[in-house]
Structures are given as structure tokens and as C-alpha cells.
């Protein structure tokens, strides 16, 4: 496959048709394709970062405790929160929100995550997390020393809430979340809790995020703590808007060198496993051939022994029949018939008077021996047939396992190979685009 003669459009089409759908390369944690829910109220259409900061500087302090109904959060904070949550995967993450308040609005300008111990359903902030939070805020947002603190046009950012993730089970507050939020509201209000669901956000391509505060619901007997949801409004900087309107329509994919190395390691591992599988199959085949040859040799020996025994038995039977005939001839000669012209008067019968003989006159014992041998032969044939049947079943079972393992390894090999090729083609496509764009 030659790529030198292909255009950038053809390269993108090649990636889309051959690699993107099969290898699911579109499932990236980049938020460029994620849609943000716009506000439906006219007063927030022209909302921007600079207008919020100007309003904050003009705002006069008030002793009245407002009832917060809106959360204004920057797009930068949304991307950082979603990025932290997606990196956490099925494990919950936690962080701090930085911003200020405007009347009944809580404005979130920035955020940062905390080093916490999380599970799939719970996240706990230890003492080290609070120490990290204090040091981070002092280094990044403290303007007293005139150092490298982040400048938001004179507006000082404070802690206005916290955020955590609910991977896969939507945005709401659990009982522990309600207790945590209520405790923070009592001692450092204004304070808001933001919950994000990274799994559903990636699945639906829409940011799943909710902002909540607690409220005491008083009844006749006791007072219980509940929560309500605030309307979330996302704003952006004018600089980002201008960049978004004038930027090239190019989808920049975040390249990960580790993913390419992982794919290469998987490719090599699949090749090693396939080679080991073939070697094991060859060894088993040689062992089976040697076993089969030995079994055939033993069967041939048994057949030869059986034929020899049958021959000896038949010879013994024929010999017995011949001796019986000769004995009858001797009896006829010693009978009272004197028609013979041979003078047999002086015969000596002492050697023939005995009725006992060492020869087997009756043929039944030989027949019994033949029957036993035939029965033994039938049993051997049955066992040999059973062994051959079991051997065939084991052979079919081994062939099925080998085929299954071979298919799995071939699939893994093809997938890893496609990922590596897709990564290389992407790199070439990007370089080709730069060359065509900036070459006169």
C-alpha cells in the first residue's frame, strides 16, 4: 500500500474506512467533540469571562445571605473536571472549585483535583489531601507576594465548592455527599457540589454534570437535610470564541506514544504465543506418531503370536486324529479274524494290553483351547477399538482447542497491527497536511 501518491483527503478516508470503525479510534478522551448545553435564558447569551470579572469588581459587599440559584462555570473548568473524571475511569475522583459569587450566582473560574483514595462508589479525602489543597491554593492563587499567582484582572478567587465523579450512575448526591456538603455549607458558605458522570458523558457525547446545594427541610417532629439542583450555565472567554471561529477545521488527535508501544508489545507477544502454540502442536504430533507406531508394532506381535498359537493348536488336533486312526488299526490286527495269511500266533501283547495311552484320543480339550483363544482375541480387538475411538476423540478435542487459540491469537495480531498502521498513517497524514498547507 503506497501512501506517497495519496492526498490528505484520501488518507483521512482510508483511516475512516479501514481503521477507525474496527479499532474504535474515535473513543478518545478529548473533549473537542463534546457538546455543552447552552443556556436558554436571554440574559446569559452574551455571558463571557471578562463581563463576569467586571461585574465582580463593581459589586459592592452586602450583608444579606443570597439564595443561590445558578452556577456559572467556565469551559476550562468543565474540560478539566471531565478530563480528571475520565482519567479516573470507574474510580471516583475529587477536586476543589475556585471562583467567586455574583448576587445569587456562584461563578467557577478554575478547579484542580486532589490526591484522594477512591473506589467505584466512594471517595475519601485524607489529611494529605487537605495539606495539598492549602499548599496549592497558596502557590497558585495567593496574590499577597506578587509572585506567580494566577491573575484574573484583580478578582481574587476563593474556594467556592468541590466536585467529584459518579462513574456510570448519573449525577446526584448520596447520603455521605449530603453530609459533606451540609458541613461545608455551615462553615464556609458559599459552597456548591458539582457531580459529573464521565462514562455517560463519553457514551452520549454530552457533558453530564450537575450542581447541588443542601437545604434543611423542617417537619413537625424533626428536621432532615435534603438538596436541590442549581441551573448550570457554561461560559467561555472571548479569546477562545475568536479562536474557535477562525481556526482551521482540523481534528487534532492527542497522540500517545505509550499506546503505540503497548500495541507493539501486544503484536510481539501474539507472535511469540502463536510460535509457541505451533511448536507445542508439533511436539504433540510427534509423540502421537511414536505412540501409534509402538501400538501398531505391539498389535502385529499379538497377531503373530495368535497365528502361531492357532497353528500349533491345529497341528495338535490333526496329530491326535492321526494317532486315533493308528490305534484303531492296531486293534483290528489283534482281533479274532484269522483271514490274514500272516502267522501271528507268537505275538506278544504285553505292550498293548494296557488301556492307558499318553495320546489325547478325544478332541474336545483342543476345541476348548481354541474357544478361549478366540475369546481373548475378541477382547483384545474390543479394547483396541475403544482405544482408537478415545484417541480420535482426544485428537478432535485438541484440534478444536488449537483452532480456537489460533483464531484468538490471529485476531489479537490483526488488531494490534491495525492500530500500529493507523498510528503511522495518522502521523503521515498530519505531516502531509502541514506540507501541503505551508508549501508554496
Curated annotation (Swiss-Prot):
Pfam families: JAB (PF01398)
GO molecular function terms attached to this record: metal ion binding; metallopeptidase activity
Tree of life domain: Eukaryota
Domain MPN span(s) in chain numbering: 71-218
Motif (JAMM motif) on chain: 164-177
Cofactor field: a divalent metal cation
Acyltransferase in keyword set: no
A Gene Ontology term for the protein's cellular component: COP9 signalosome
Subcellular location(s) of the protein: Cytoplasm; Nucleus
Disordered: annotated span: 319-343, 376-400
Binding site for Zn(2+): 164, 166, 177
UniProt-listed Enzyme Commission number(s): 3.4.-.-
Biased composition (Polar residues): 319-341
Domain comment, as recorded: The JAMM motif is essential for the protease activity of the CSN complex resulting in deneddylation of cullins. It constitutes the catalytic center of the complex.
Function statement: Catalytic component of the COP9 signalosome (CSN) complex that acts as an regulator of the ubiquitin (Ubl) conjugation pathway by mediating the deneddylation of the cullin subunit of SCF-type E3 ubiquitin-protein ligase complexes. The CSN complex is involved in the regulation of the mating pheromone response.
Subunit structure: Component of a COP9 signalosome-like (CSN) complex, composed of at least RRI1/CSN5, CSN9, RRI2/CSN10, PCI8/CSN11, CSN12 and CSI1. Within this complex it probably interacts directly with CSN12. Also interacts with RPN5.
Family: Belongs to the peptidase M67A family. CSN5 subfamily.
Name the record gives this protein: COP9 signalosome complex subunit 5
Organism: Saccharomyces cerevisiae (strain YJM789)
